[in-house]
């Protein structure tokens, strides 16, 4: 009986720690976005013309912009080339600090749909761009509000 209790407690700690991992995400601010934009523009060598479009939330379908958005999503901490998007972290960013998010929520489902639909795109930059655009095209105001534009 003691062994069973120890095993159950161990399982509870593992599950609690796994769930806690998502609570480690810190919601980013408009200042963070501005810093990330500067860093990513430099990384991908975006032209002044493209930079002006990005500031207006316009993202043309070209290789530079694809990699720019990949960089932005990586800086936010919810995309990596090996695992793709972390849907839960994106949802936390959109919901804002202190708001509990649930997988059954409509927004969560939309994020997951876009991430899954575009997970098989060619290169990592294309995956990030097309999945990001999928979500932004239907939820731009929510995205903008999440960084207090």
Swiss-Prot record:
It comes from Drosophila melanogaster. It is found in: Secreted. The gene is Obp99b. InterPro entries: PBP/GOBP, PBP_GOBP_sf. It comes from the Eukaryota. It holds the Pfam family PBP_GOBP. Residues 1-16 form the signal peptide. SUPFAM superfamilies: Insect pheromone/odorant-binding proteins. Keywords: Disulfide bond, Olfaction, Secreted, Sensory transduction, Signal, Transport. One of its GO terms (molecular function) is odorant binding. The keyword Secreted applies. This is General odorant-binding protein 99b. Expressed in adult olfactory system. Expressed in subsets of sensilla in both olfactory organs, the maxillary palps, and third antennal segments. Its main location: secreted. PANTHER family: GENERAL ODORANT-BINDING PROTEIN 99A-RELATED, ODORANT BINDING PROTEIN-RELATED. Changing residue 140 to R: In strain: 788A. Disulfide bonds join 40-71, 67-125, 114-134. One of its GO terms (biological process) is sensory perception of chemical stimulus. The keyword Disulfide bond applies. Changing residue 82 to D: In strain: 10A, 100A, 101A, 149A, 158A, 189A, 195A, 223A, 233A, 237A, 28A, 303A, 312A, 319A, 324A, 325A, 32A, 335A, 340A, 348A, 350A, 352A, 356A, 358A, 359A, 360A, 362A, 365A, 367A, 371A, 380A, 383A, 386A, 387A, 390A, 393A, 398A, 40A, 405A, 41A, 443A, 486A, 514A, 517A, 528A, 554A, 59A, 627A, 639A, 672A, 703A, 707A, 712A, 730A, 739A, 761A, 762A, 767A, 770A, 786A, 788A, 793A, 804A, 820A, 833A, 834A, 836A, 849A, 850A, 851A, 852A, 853A and 855A. GO terms for cellular component: extracellular region; extracellular space. Present in the aqueous fluid surrounding olfactory sensory dendrites and are thought to aid in the capture and transport of hydrophobic odorants into and through this fluid. Belongs to the PBP/GOBP family.
């Amino acid at each position: 009986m003691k062994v069973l209790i120890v095993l159950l407690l161990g399982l509870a700690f593992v599950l609690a720690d796994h769930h806690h991992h998502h609570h480690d995400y810190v919601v980013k601010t408009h200042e963070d976005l501005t810093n990330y934009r500067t860093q990513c523009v430099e990384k991908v060598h975006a032209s002044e013309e493209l930079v002006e479009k990005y500031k207006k939330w316009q993202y043309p379908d070209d290789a530079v912009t694809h990699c720019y958005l990949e960089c932005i999503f990586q800086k936010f901490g919810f995309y990596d080339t090996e695992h793709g998007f972390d849907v839960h972290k994106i949802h936390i960013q959109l919901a804002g600090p202190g708001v509990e998010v649930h997988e059954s929520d409509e927004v969560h489902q939309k994020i997951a749909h876009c991430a899954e639909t575009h997970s098989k795109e060619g290169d990592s930059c294309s995956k990030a761009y097309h999945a990001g655009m999928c979500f932004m095209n239907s939820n731009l105001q929510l995205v903008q509000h999440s960084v207090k534009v």
